[in-house]
């Protein structure tokens, strides 16, 4: 049975497109900005990457921290302390110079121009999921970037159920 190249070519094109949609790329960590944002070297440029699906407390006074304080009823000092704790936790998982893999989802950038992605540590674990599982982040689901929503929900329930991190 011989398959002609003409018949095989469309299949190969579709396959390569499908594989590239969620391809991982290796990047270097430059620094941890806060609990859900990193600076990375991406394609030769310094870029910010916002971790998809998670939201850690703010670690600096800004309008978002004020809204968070109003929404939760926590004072600003508590919000900032929780944000710093989340950032410190992320710093235990990634350091400047570390090589990690990133996977972008459907929407590649947010309105601030930051990359939106899932970050994989050298041990293969997803950083986004590890932060949630350890209790240092809430869930933040923004369609269409929902590829790993179920994993993150399970991690969140596990953290809350076991009083981990900020849920102590």
Each language-model region and where it sits:
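Small beta-barrel nucleic-acid-binding modules, primarily SNase/OB-fold domains
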Residues: 2-11, 19-168
């Amino acid at each position: 049975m011989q398959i002609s190249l003409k018949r095989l070519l469309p299949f190969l094109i579709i396959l390569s497109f499908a594989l590239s949609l969620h391809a991982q790329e290796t990047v270097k960590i430059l620094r941890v900005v806060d609990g859900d944002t990193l600076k990375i070297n991406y394609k030769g440029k310094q870029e910010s990457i916002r971790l998809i699906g998670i939201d850690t407390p703010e670690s600096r006074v800004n309008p978002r921290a004020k809204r968070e304080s109003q929404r939760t009823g926590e004072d600003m000092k508590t919000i900032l302390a929780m944000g710093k704790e989340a950032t410190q936790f992320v710093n235990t998982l990634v350091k400047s110079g570390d090589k990690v893999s990133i996977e972008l989802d459907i929407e590649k950038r947010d309105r601030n121009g930051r990359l939106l992605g899932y970050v994989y540590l050298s041990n293969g674990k997803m950083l986004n999921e590890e932060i949630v599982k350890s209790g240092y982040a809430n869930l933040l689901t923004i369609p269409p970037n929902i590829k790993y929503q179920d994993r993150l929900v399970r991690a969140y329930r596990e953290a809350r159920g076991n009083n981990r991190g900020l849920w102590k």
